[in-house]
């Protein structure tokens, strides 16, 4: 886990802005199934004309929603995410009382130059007491950047978990036509991602 130093009322403190990186997160069969599903011609995508509120007007993407505002978008949507939920539960990042706010797959197309698409928080109407997992489906030189300039590269079968307190941005890829990731925002009192007691290790 990683902390972040910041200035708060003229005091320099370590705030609980943590993120974890877990490689080889899913089994090869589950990983391969996601990739084949997303690259199948019949998989439905929705055009998002602006990636986030801080993106440029022409920064677009495609998305496939499973859960939106705590509601399953279609029958079977939660089942499609079961491999990820299962691993999060066994790794103690989720518990039985977990509430999923939003879950979707993102599709970004290749750009001529690598660039950030705007720092943002995924959920803006629920405070910052939530967690995010970004699951990277394929290898490419794009990824996720935090405000402290930490860059997490999009590596196949990698999971990035972090506090909703942390602003982050998508970084586009230049080496593959498509970049896929699964983004899930959730809350669970048992998850270790936010530690209010800084004495905990």
Functional labels for PLM-detected ranges:
Residues 2-98, 201:
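Non-heme Fe(II)/2-oxoglutarate
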Residues 20, 95-113:
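A short glycine-rich, His/Asp/Glu-containing loop-to-beta-strand
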Residues 42, 46, 145, 184-201:
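Double-stranded beta-helix
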Residues 133-135, 176-192:
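A short hydrophobic beta-strand segment most commonly corresponding to one strand
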Residues 152-168:
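Conserved metal-binding segment of the jelly-roll/cupin
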């Amino acid at each position: 886990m990683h902390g972040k130093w910041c200035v708060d009322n003229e005091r320099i403190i370590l705030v609980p802005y943590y993120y974890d990186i877990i490689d080889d997160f899913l089994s090869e069969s589950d990983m391969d199934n996601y990739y084949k599903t997303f690259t199948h011609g019949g998989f439905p995508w929705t055009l998002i004309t602006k990636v986030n509120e801080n993106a440029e007007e022409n920064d677009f993407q495609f998305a496939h929603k499973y859960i939106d505002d705590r509601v399953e978008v279609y029958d079977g949507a939660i089942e499609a995410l079961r491999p990820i939920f299962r691993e999060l539960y066994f790794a103690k990042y989720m518990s039985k009382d977990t509430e999923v706010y939003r879950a979707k797959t993102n599709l970004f197309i290749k750009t001529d130059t690598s660039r950030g698409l705007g720092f943002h928080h995924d959920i803006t109407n629920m405070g910052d007491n939530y967690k995010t997992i970004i699951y990277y489906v394929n290898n490419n030189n794009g990824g996720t950047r935090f405000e402290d300039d930490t860059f997490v590269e999009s590596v196949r079968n990698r999971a990035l978990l972090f506090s909703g307190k942390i602003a982050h941005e998508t970084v586009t890829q230049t080496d593959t036509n498509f970049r896929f990731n699964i983004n899930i925002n959730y809350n669970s009192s048992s998850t270790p991602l936010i530690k209010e007691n800084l004495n905990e290790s």
